[in-house]
């Protein structure tokens, strides 16, 4: 009986092995040698010619030899190898861009790893298929189509699998040449190469009425029949820098360091988009009445789940320490202006639980207000908890820093939310050239890895600023005041009794805007945007007369409240004995 059972079991095992072998044969690498024929049996060094083909310059026995030869031949030179998964067979180039193609390993998103460290704690992020990557170099190649490249993914300095990208020299972009990309997909998407004309991401300065603006344009890496791909993003992302010239196109690898050339060699200046890098621990200055006005201006009616939610977002801001404008515009983006199926049927404005691989897993809430409060008070809170592995800063940012690193696969997620916030600000100001949220507070970037945040000047350390053990980029803070060579900042973390409060897995916790503040040495912060930093007010008890040259008027007691006016007349102002519970008059 036992022998018979063994024989019976062997049949399905053999069948399974045959199935796997057949599957392997079906998914075996296609050579695509007919697209761009090669003249070398090993490593071929070529230059891209004006028709989009390759002129052979030499054959080499190793990748190292070929790579060295390529570097002597200028920007149009490449190394090609027959074992490459890409139809062009390019495995290295002197200048160009890459496009994500995770389908070669059955993925719908591409995971990339922090460059320059072998630590098991190296940071990672992920992007959608067919998205642009700024190429730096090919760092390894095994002769069988596998290797690694060094590239930049929306600011994130990355190590990326060569198998899962297609390399495109800038010659194809500059000369408007078509190139075959894709192929060797194992998940049924783009099973054969497609012909496309790639485009480089640009930032162009435009004058629109009273606003000098930055127009961001990014393209997908997929099209057919040699056409130009569709936009991955086409956005007015905010005001342009004062030094930027109308009509000029700039290039950037990280959204803030700008260059005059697509190779990003000729640096022209640094400029941080206020809405993109604004810490969420910063109060919005725009009232609830403006929220419906913004929706109406975009032809959104009362049937939207976002209608009449202005007070809800401002209450969430007051209770949980999340900027109401940025929270609202995130909801606009995630919920399709409050009209998506998740918003209408589940009161889910933020896509919680809806993963790229399983969108139907999305959460349901009993009301819109509940969904907003849970997002602000619990879910998003952990993305700006410095102890959480998803923490990369408290701004929306990009793939280098901010909530966008781990929150979404969209490489332009932070820019899309920034664009909506800027649009909201203009509408609130009736397009008169003014902006309310923009530059409303001084914002700074902490310069040093693992810098300390103190409970007072020269006091005790409450927490440090690193994003884990290997990484810190663009840790932005709202600067509230200056005193004795120190900056008072709005704390990213919740604080309790002068110490960081661990919020993981806790219920709702009220964020006190006046007590959740810290101190950092002024020399450790580079101011990047906003108003001049005010001096920390001196505490006065009793009647006094203070001579001042001007007076900033705020919405409430404390520097955490927005400035609503400025008394410019020189003179004496009476300060009365009216000290508030929080210590401010």
Predicted regions: what they are:
Residues 492-494, 558, 578-580:
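Solvent-exposed coil/turn segments that connect beta secondary-structure elements
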Residues 334:
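Pyridoxal 5′-phosphate
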Residues 126, 470, 565-566, 579:
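Residue-level "contact hotspot" at macromolecular interaction interfaces
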Residues 564, 575-585:
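Short, intrinsically disordered, charge-balanced linker/junction segments flanking boundaries
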Residues 2-26:
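Sec-dependent N-terminal signal peptides of Gram-positive bacterial secreted proteins and lipoproteins
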